[in-house]
Amino acid sequence: VGSMQRFGVPMGFGGPHAAFFACSERYKRLIPGRIVGQTVSKNGEKSLRLALQTREQHIRREKATSNICTAQSLLAIISSFYAIYHGSFGLTQIAKRIVNLRINLESCLSELGFDISDGSRFDSIDVYSEYSEKIHDEALKNGFNLRILPLGSTPEDSTGFGLSLDELSDEKEIHKIITFIANVIGKKEDLKPICLDKEDFFIKNIPLRNDPWMQQDIFKNYQSETDLMRYIFRLAEKDFSLVDGMIPLGSCTMKLNSAAELSPVSWANLSSIHPFAPSNQTKGYVQIIS
């Protein structure tokens, strides 16, 4: 089981996000909803069909699992098109860049005297320091929320801080973080310029998969903005929506989600709040939820 949040969906104060999951053959009939499979039509053409259905309409009611499905289609569509647009090569480059940023951040922190623990990790660093409280205070002044360690503690009684990077992080952001940390511990003169090697990514402590993945045609054919836009429009033309007519009552796969409900997903001033953000930064979200 995993979250698709990193595939083009903002944090949104912790959700909602689409998920992906896999299971062994023995559990496949317990999967909720419908599974679409690829087959060949009688004319020899590639086609898609419903391969497995677990709804009350199709199997005995006591074995149905559709009652635990949720309406996450918009989030799943966003993540799917993010993967389609970037393909396996693009996603690999994004991941390698994040790892490279993380390695540079670790290197800078080590040069400032911080002890960075060994271990396999992707985008996050945990650092324990006697300067933890002061670093948290300085981070807030510079517009950053650092993860408070141990989890559940306050900046005042914390013993460490954590940093996580993503595809929006860059060298300028890392330099800003390192600068205010160096100021706190009195080592500003030890700062060195951050310069990423764009050609040869130094990946360490992460076991990389070498087998091919996302090799289906769908992840290779729509990697320009124009191609993707035309593909989305062709799919939309096949759909039945309010553009075509009223959605019939009782159709559980076609419930109305109004545009006003869906569009805030892309609002930068609403959708980018981290679920661990301090309560004094999330008053608007608390009001919406309550």
Question: Model regions: which residues?
Answer:
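Active-site C-terminal subdomain of aminotransferase-like
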Residues: M4-G119
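Conserved N-terminal alpha-helix of the aminotransferase class I/II PLP-enzyme fold
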Residues: S224, N269-S290
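Flexible inter-domain linker/hinge segments
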Residues: E171-P248, C252-A260, V265-A268
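Short Gly/Ser/Thr- and Asp/Glu-enriched loop/turn motifs at secondary-structure junctions
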Residues: S117-S124, I148-F161
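Buried hydrophobic positions in well-ordered alpha/beta secondary-structure cores of metabolic enzymes
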Residues: A19, I98, I125, L163, ...
